Amino acid sequence: MKILKYFAILFFFLPYSAQSNEWTLVYENSLNGDKVFIDISNIEKKDNLIYFWDMLSHKEYNDTHKYWSITAYIEANCDEFWYRKLNLLMHEKEMGMNPAFFETKNRSHIIIKPKKEKSGQFILLKTACDLSN
């Protein structure tokens, strides 16, 4: 019974990003080596919207803001080709492998409509839309 309690507590306190093990590389920034991943195991489709997690893992630790990676829960509309990050978590370790030390919510007013096909934002949204079909 103690073991079951331990695992329940551990699972509850781990951030979502660490619980997932299906992060797939979407693109790597050729200028700075940063990588963006998408969690292919948790893409949800509701009406004309999709919901998914992405992760930015920097090549180097960000000394200015004291983090290494960021995970974000995203809402997207593939027909109108836009997305917004509903929740953003900052992590002190690579690949979101520790509990988030900072969380932002209520970012739904920031809508991103990528135009350039070679931009990271465009590639992320196109990949998520393709995977949701």
Sequence positions of predicted segments:
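N-terminal secretory-pathway/extracellular module detecting exported/lumenal segments
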Residues: Q19-A72, N77-N133
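Sec-dependent N-terminal signal peptides
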Residues: L4-A18
